[in-house]
């Protein structure tokens, strides 16, 4: 029997996260260090320091003083963190770091954990997952063009990646490359290693990730044997470990943003008058808010259901695909209706809603566009 009862302890943690984001993080949303390419490193460090002081930093990773939480519990807390796009940044549960911490926690050896994972968990450095390429390796990673060749006891990597989130300034790098004779392989190295070239930061419609999204070139990147992450040729299998949880945490965070956008739209509908009464009393507005509330609750329950599947020890690939496809599409509709309810204010930066609209539009592509998930779902249905 599925039971989504929120315990008093979980409710208290949720309320603490929500209060922290509302009281400490939201005031930074209009900070000049919020750039067209996302928050600067300086702003991120200041926010992380606040979360560390509050005892809430990286709450999703179990360690001394931080208890383990289930995927369902994570969903409750991540939604609270998503009240502001800067909330996950401050709390160190934003992409790509959150997914990278999960992956490294599964396959990194003790030395790699100490050097590359622990500093990310502690909020002292950021990480990247360098897979996506301009030639197509993204939704179809088997088109991987970045190569790795053996060089004595080590490796040499060459290739170009793009849309690499947070690359500029990140120190923990997970790189996927096609290793001669073995296939897709993961490597782990420091971002300051010679041969990693940040060509440029791309101009994208979203701006909620530190340092934005970059084009990266690997120019004879020499790595030692110790840079191998896991086993040779196992990158796709390892990526699957990260896949379902990362899809769902994206959904959790954006759900929090949708709840806030709905709250702003509701406040406006109660106070803005037109034709002799508050606009929310006009069906054209009220029905949009009702549709939003229905969609938000549907998304929440689907996320919790998929998380429950993971908590039963299942991989949840099918369930996470369905959830990611539905939630990304429905939350975009929620954002669009909030913009419509707000009218002219909705297309401005007078509220966070326009920014949420831009960000959640990009979410329909992150971790696989909707159509790729629909194809995977249909393939399984027809196979079974």
Give each language-model segment a name.
Residues 1-87, 94, 107-112, 119, ...:
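Alpha-helical interface subdomain recognition
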Residues 145, 158-199:
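A short core secondary-structure module
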């Amino acid at each position: 029997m599925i039971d989504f009862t929120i315990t008093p302890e979980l409710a208290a943690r949720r309320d603490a996260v929500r209060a922290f984001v509302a009281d400490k993080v939201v005031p930074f949303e209009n900070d000049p260090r919020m750039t067209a390419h996302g928050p600067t490193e300086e702003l991120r460090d200041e926010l992380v320091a606040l979360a560390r002081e509050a005892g809430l930093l990286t709450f999703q990773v179990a360690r001394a003083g931080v208890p383990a939480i289930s995927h369902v519990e994570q969903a409750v807390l991540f939604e609270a963190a998503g009240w502001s796009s800067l909330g996950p940044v401050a709390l160190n549960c934003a992409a790509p770091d959150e997914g990278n911490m999960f992956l490294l926690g599964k396959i990194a050896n003790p030395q790699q954990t100490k050097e590359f994972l622990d500093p990310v968990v502690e909020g002292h450095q950021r990480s990247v997952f360098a897979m996506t390429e301009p030639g197509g390796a993204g939704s179809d990673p088997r088109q991987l063009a970045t190569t790795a060749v053996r060089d004595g006891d080590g490796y040499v990597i060459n290739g170009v990646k793009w849309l690499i989130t947070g690359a500029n300034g990140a120190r923990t790098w997970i790189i996927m490359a096609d290793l001669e004779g073995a296939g897709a392989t993961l490597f782990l190295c420091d971002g300051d290693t010679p041969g990693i070239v940040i060509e440029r930061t791309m101009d994208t419609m979203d701006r909620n990730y530190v340092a934005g999204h970059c084009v990266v070139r690997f120019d004879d990147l020499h790595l030692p044997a110790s840079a191998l992450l896991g086993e040779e040729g196992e990158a796709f299998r390892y990526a699957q470990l990260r896949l379902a949880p990362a899809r769902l945490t994206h959904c959790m965070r954006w759900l929090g943003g949708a709840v806030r956008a709905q709250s702003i739209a509701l406040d406006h509908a109660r106070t803005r008058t037109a034709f002799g009464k508050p606009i929310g009393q006009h069906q054209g507005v009220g029905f949009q808010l009702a549709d939003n509330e229905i969609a938000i609750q549907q998304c929440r329950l689907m996320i919790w259901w998929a998380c429950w599947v993971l908590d039963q020890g299942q991989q949840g690939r099918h369930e996470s695909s369905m959830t990611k496809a539905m939630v990304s599409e429905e939350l975009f509709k929620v954002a669009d209706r909030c913009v419509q309810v707000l009218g002219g204010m909705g297309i401005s930066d007078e509220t966070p809603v326009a920014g949420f609209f831009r960000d959640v539009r990009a979410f329909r592509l992150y971790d696989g566009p909707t159509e790729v998930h629909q194809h995977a779902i249909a393939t399984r249905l027809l196979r079974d």
